[in-house]
Each structure stands twice: as C-alpha cells, then as structure tokens.
C-alpha cells in the first residue's frame, strides 16, 4: 500500500490512535538509544537505567544521561510531532501512546499524550517523595562539574536522591498512562504506528489490541516489524510520510460523514446552522488547497 493510501485511511478514521517510537524523535536529531550513537553503546548501558544500580550509585545514571536526557531542550519537535498535534486539533487523532521520554509531543502542542515509559518531566525523591520539575534539575546540573559523584547528584532537603519519572529496568510501567494507552488502542478504528520496531513489550502489544477489537493498523517504520503481515499498510520513510500527511486535508466524503455525525447529535436549529456553516467553510478551504498546492494554508 502506498503512503497516500495510508494517509487516506488515517484522515478518514473515526477514532485514530498513534503509537510512536524512537524513529519519530531521530527526525529531531535525538539519537536512538539502540542506534550506532545511542546510549546502549555506553559501557555502563545496562546499569544506567537499572533501578537497583540507581539506588546503589545514582551518579551512573546522571553521568550517563547528562547530555541526552538533560540536554533535551536543544532539540525541537520534528515535522512528525507537529503534524500529529495538528491532527489532534482537527479532531481526527484521539491520543498518542509514546515510548519516547523526550516530551517533544507536548512541546509540539499535543495534549492527549500517554508516556508508557514515563518521562523526566518530574523527578521524585526516593526517600520522602517530594517532586521537582525537569527545569529545576537541569538548572542544578548546569552548576555542577563535568563528572558527578554520588554526592553531587540532585538531592532533596531530606538527603534523598531525586529520580526521574522514567521507567527503569526493575520498575513497573506507569499504570495510569499504560491503562489509558490500552483503552485508546481498543477504541481506535485505526492505529498508526510510527518509528518503532514493535519489539519492546508491553507497549508493542498495543497495536494487537486494536486488531483484536476489529480496527486496522498501519505501520510507518524503516525496518521490519513483527506485525507487518497483519498491518493493512506499511510505509518506510517517516519524514516523507509526515510531510505528505501534514499537507493533506480531509476530502469531501470524510467531511460529509463528520457533518452528518454532528447534526445527528444537535436538536437546536441555531447550532445546526452553525455546524453547517463551519463545515462549508472547511470544504471551501479544501477546494482552495486542491487548486493551489503551493498555498501555505495547505
């Protein structure tokens, strides 16, 4: 299936869900943890995100992640992040389940984001539970020397170490985010998987929930995945796909379906008239885009 056919299915979805992985963030310049320049090439890789090692010597984590995790502000959301945010604002996308910890979906403007592996947005004291914001931790680390000892890492007034709300090996996934992701997958009539090889569970099981519930799954990833044979379509170039999706507007058929759905829930004639007017404006805008593909509004 060609990319434009996948895009038609995505735009026409009644309840679109998206699962994103590292391939989305590499477009922003963030190294894939498992890539050639990734964190897992670090000799301490197995210990960096291990909760037992963190409690034993938190400097292993803070030294290993100082550049990648605490330098995230230098990266900007990619075209893919921005496109997904637009789809949410248009009411097509119902939510994003992401394996990424970089918070770029939120910076792009997405609101319904479920971080199934957590994120460093908040840090909590391992002793008393007090929370500190990511920006505070970054600011503190900027005052420290190049190499941290266990005593140099961010600590609470009680003496406890601040740990990011990233899921470490040996910890359970954040229950609220993962349950919400499962519900999102089950309700979706279309799930779009972008930038993940679907090998890390339990997040990799989310598209299967969509399939089991009767929905369709489309995959955009540069390498094969275990679900390729079960997907309704597959594309490989994430950047190209994102660009095409960004410039695609709903066709008349999908607009008409949306209009009828809206009117069926409205009893007040004034509201009905307003809904019809809004849809006609959107249709005229779509025609304008088709006639002038170079228009910035397209």
Segments the model singles out, each with a brief description of its role:
Residues 1-248:
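Conserved catalytic core of sirtuin-type NAD+-dependent deacylases
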Residues 240-242, 246-298:
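Low-acidity, Ser/Thr- and Arg-rich intrinsically disordered low-complexity segments
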């Amino acid at each position: 299936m060609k990319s434009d056919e996948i895009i038609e299915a995505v735009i026409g979805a009644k309840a679109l869900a998206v699962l994103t992985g590292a391939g989305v963030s590499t477009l922003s310049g963030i190294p894939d943890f498992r890539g050639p320049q990734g964190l897992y090439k670090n000799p301490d890789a197995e210990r960096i995100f291990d909760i037992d090692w963190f409690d034993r010597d938190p400097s292993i984590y803070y030294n290993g992640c100082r550049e990648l995790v605490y330098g995230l502000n230098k990266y900007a959301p990619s075209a893919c992040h921005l496109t997904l945010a637009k789809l949410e604002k248009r009411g097509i996308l119902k939510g994003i389940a992401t394996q990424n910890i970089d918070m770029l979906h939120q910076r792009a403007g997405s609101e319904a984001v479920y971080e199934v592996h957590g994120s460093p947005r908040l840090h909590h004291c391992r002793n008393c539970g007090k929370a500190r914001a990511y920006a505070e931790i970054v600011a503190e680390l900027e005052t420290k020397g190049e190499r941290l000892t266990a005593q140099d890492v961010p600590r609470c007034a009680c003496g406890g170490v601040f740990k990011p709300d990233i899921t470490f090996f040996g910890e359970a996934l954040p229950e609220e985010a993962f349950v919400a992701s499962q519900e999102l997958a089950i309700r979706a009539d279309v799930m779009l998987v972008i930038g993940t090889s679907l090998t890390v569970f339990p997040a990799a099981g989310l598209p299967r929930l969509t399939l089991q519930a009767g929905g369709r799954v489309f995959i955009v990833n540069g390498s094969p995945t275990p679900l390729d044979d079960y997907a309704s379509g597959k594309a490989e170039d994430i950047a190209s796909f994102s660009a095409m999706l960004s410039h695609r507007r709903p066709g008349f058929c999908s607009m008409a379906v949306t209009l009828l759905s809206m009117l069926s829930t409205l009893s007040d004639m004034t509201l009905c008239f307003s809904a019809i007017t809004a849809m006609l404006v959107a249709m005229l805008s779509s025609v304008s885009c088709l006639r002038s593909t170079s228009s910035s509004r397209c």
